[in-house]
């Protein structure tokens, strides 16, 4: 199977209910954070019983941004066999453009993480 399941966890409540993200982590770091992207990628893989999972959390706008977390800030998490990578991104444009950029970046990160993992497993980290 290529796609086993997906979770849409827009609200903090759904992040807690569907993915079991702890309330104290959400309160400490906020929903748009490296820590939450990491927890989402970790938990999604466990719940789906899969080797690869991807998470995104961000502010697509047009509202919701702050000076510390502006519109366009996105964290993308990728979990490949328990190895989790999180990338911070800053995208420009309207809500639709930010969402499109997020999907493109998430797929690129997933590809990079899978290739890196299997390169290390197969070739000991050396390119063949």
Q: What is each stretch, according to the model?
A:
Residues 1-128:
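Short alpha-helical segments enriched in small residues
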């Amino acid at each position: 199977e290529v796609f086993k399941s997906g979770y849409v966890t827009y609200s903090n409540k759904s992040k807690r209910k569907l993915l079991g993200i702890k309330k104290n982590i959400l309160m400490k770091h906020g929903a748009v954070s490296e820590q939450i992207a990491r927890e989402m990628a970790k938990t999604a893989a466990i719940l789906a019983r899969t080797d690869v999972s991807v998470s995104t959390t961000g502010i697509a706008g047009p509202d919701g941004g702050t000076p510390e977390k502006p519109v366009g800030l996105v964290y993308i998490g990728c979990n490949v066999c328990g190895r989790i990578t999180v990338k911070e991104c800053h995208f420009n444009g309207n809500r639709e453009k930010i969402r499109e950029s997020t999907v493109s970046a998430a797929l690129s990160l997933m590809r990079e993480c899978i290739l890196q993992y299997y390169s290390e497993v197969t070739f000991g980290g050396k390119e063949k």
